[in-house]
């Protein structure tokens, strides 16, 4: 392949709206171009990398017993009504109508369509288990698309679904898929962690996220050397042992217009750890009071999961006033009536705490659990914070890292099969719901994640198996007969052995060619100059070696042997 014949529009500078390294380098190297907010065109170089990532994933899916399928990009509303996700999915769901006014959505995920397929064709336990997977374009109307293909409105995803007769079989297969995802991450050259995660709108009883470690990652995770790991939304928080104090008489304190915990703490010279923060939420249209220690935040994902609520949001001021008889900022658990109270583990044993008094400009001092208030549920509903102890070993302090989620695996159970009536007959002729697993991986997101983790000041550093080309041959004067002859001979010998080779035949200065090779991230560069050829040599440089002083000289036949050895051809 000749550089001059390909569309590789490299740029010296990145666009001003490119916000992270991967976007800058993907645009500058000619991999992508922006069409509109959240929509990108994948150019030849980008597509070559994408196909190589696809093949890595496909090999692992096939090894796990998967069968590849293709689903439409447009799904009928009727299927989404069966699972109640037509409205629950929110504004991210692209909706459209055809000329007959029938409603559809652009595929954001494929649980409904694959369950519909299976319920039509799987009738007996003898047909189970089965796993289907596809590479398909997905659409999500992100409120603020950013970070290039990392969080776009259109993206390529591999989604897989497994179907089982019982939970035990799902558990066994989930481990198979967990291992497959681990292998994909290793083959892509990632430094990564698989961590426990919240299941979100997909649902199910348990899930893992596969997180690529990078400071630019949107997700925060916690981990411990004992092996525990979770994203911050899922991280378990322990009951806090707190010093017992003799309960003191409760006392109202006038705090003028001060209501923020930090301000009240300063006014009364108290630590926020002595406060009980009381927040009023609306869960499935009913108010609920939620309590957490003053130095913690409420984890809304944990809270919604605990309540089993379809929808949840903070109450508006009018609702807060009707529940507490006070404006926002003065709520407290003592005296609340006709409302469910949920207390975090951090407050249940807090002695002589300070709370709002349910009265404007007043707080209540020396509030104690069971004496002054009770809770309907005491559970872990707080966000993890630095300094918290690992919930698994209960010894070490949790460590925090940031990462990019590139894969997510779920144990769905019968969430979709029950709502869509996907059942089978067991060995005794009894009808049972099919048990499901779900396994997604963002293919275009993997490209960006690799670049975020593997780049330098000069450009991208691809691994050998993913690079758009494995070798670039740079003849400094392609018009010279001997240079051209040597270039084409090396090209033919390497190509015949299966290597992906690019000849940079452009009439450009050597410096421009070298900069583009480094920018694109081609692992090995062969430079052919008249000067070196006069001595029977060509130059070989590995992209990962960095500076040009890492250049090695070889005979033309020797450089072929060396590269075939490196690539094990």
Curated annotation (Swiss-Prot):
GO terms in the biological process aspect are: prolyl-tRNA aminoacylation
User: PROSITE patterns attached here?
Assistant: AA_TRNA_LIGASE_II (PS50862)
The main place the protein resides is cytoplasm
Q: Belongs to which family?
A: Belongs to the class-II aminoacyl-tRNA synthetase family. ProS type 1 subfamily.
Domains as described in the record? Consists of three domains: the N-terminal catalytic domain, the editing domain and the C-terminal anticodon-binding domain.
Which HAMAP family does this entry report, sorted A to Z?
Pro_tRNA_synth_type1
Q: By what name is this protein known? A: Proline--tRNA ligase
Native source species: Endomicrobium trichonymphae
């Amino acid at each position: 392949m000749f550089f001059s014949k390909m569309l590789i529009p490299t740029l010296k500078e990145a666009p001003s709206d490119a916000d992270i390294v991967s976007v800058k380098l993907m645009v500058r190297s000619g991999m992508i171009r922006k069409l509109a907010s959240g929509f990108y065109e994948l150019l030849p170089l980008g597509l070559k990398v994408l196909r190589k990532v696809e093949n890595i994933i496909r090999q692992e899916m096939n090894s796990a017993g998967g069968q590849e399928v293709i689903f439409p990009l447009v799904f009928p509303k009727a299927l989404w009504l069966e699972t109640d996700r037509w409205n629950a999915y929110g504004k991210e769901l692209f909706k459209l109508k055809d000329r007959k006014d029938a409603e559809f959505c652009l595929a954001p995920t494929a649980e409904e369509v694959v369950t519909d397929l299976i319920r039509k064709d799987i009738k007996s336990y003898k047909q189970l288990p089965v796993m289907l997977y596809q590479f398909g374009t997905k659409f999500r109307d992100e409120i603020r698309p950013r970070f290039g293909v990392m969080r776009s409105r259109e993206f390529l995803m591999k989604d897989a679904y497994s179907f089982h007769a019982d939970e035990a079989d799902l558990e066994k297969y989930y481990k198979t898929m967990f291992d497959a995802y681990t292998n994909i991450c290793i083959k892509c050259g990632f430094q990564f962690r698989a961590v426990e995660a919240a299941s979100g709108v997909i649902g199910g009883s348990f899930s893992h996220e596969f997180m690529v470690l990078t400071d630019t990652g949107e997700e925060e995770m916690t981990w411990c050397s004992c092996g525990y790991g979770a994203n911050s939304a899922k991280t378990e928080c322990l009951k806090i042992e707190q010093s017992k104090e003799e309960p003191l008489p409760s006392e109202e304190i006038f705090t003028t217009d001060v209501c923020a915990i930090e301000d009240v703490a300063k006014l009364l010279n108290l630590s926020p750890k002595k406060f009980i923060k009381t927040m009023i939420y609306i869960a499935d249209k009913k108010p609920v009071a939620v309590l957490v220690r003053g130095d913690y935040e409420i984890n809304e994902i944990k809270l919604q999961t605990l309540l089993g609520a379809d929808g949840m949001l903070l109450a508006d001021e009018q609702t807060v006033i009707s529940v507490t008889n006070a404006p926002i900022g003065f709520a407290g658990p003592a005296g609340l009536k006709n409302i469910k109270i949920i207390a975090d583990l951090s407050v249940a044993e807090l002695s002589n705490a300070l709370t709002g008094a349910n009265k404007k400009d007043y707080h209540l001092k020396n509030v104690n659990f069971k004496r002054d208030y009770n809770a309907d549920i005491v559970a872990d509903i707080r966000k993890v914070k630095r300094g918290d102890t690992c919930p698994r070993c209960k010894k070490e302090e949790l460590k925090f890292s940031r990462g990019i989620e590139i894969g997510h695996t779920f144990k769905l159970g019968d969430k979709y099969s029950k709502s869509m009536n996907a059942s089978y007959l067991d060995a005794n002729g009894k009808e049972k719901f099919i048990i499901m697993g779900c396994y997604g991986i963002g293919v275009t997101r993997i490209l960006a994640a690799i670049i975020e983790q593997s780049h330098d000041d000069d450009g991208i550093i691809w691994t050998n198996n993913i690079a758009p080309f494995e070798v670039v041959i740079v003849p400094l004067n392609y018009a010279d007969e001997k240079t051209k002859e040597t270039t084409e001979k090396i090209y033919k010998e390497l190509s015949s052995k299966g290597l992906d080779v690019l000849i940079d035949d452009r009439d450009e200065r050597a410096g421009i060619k070298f900069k583009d090779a480094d920018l694109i991230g081609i692992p090995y560069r062969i430079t052919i100059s008249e000067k070196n050829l006069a001595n029977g040599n060509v130059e070989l440089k590995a992209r990962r070696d960095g500076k040009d002083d890492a250049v090695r000289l070889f005979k033309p036949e020797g450089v072929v042997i060396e590269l075939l050895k490196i690539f094990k051809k």
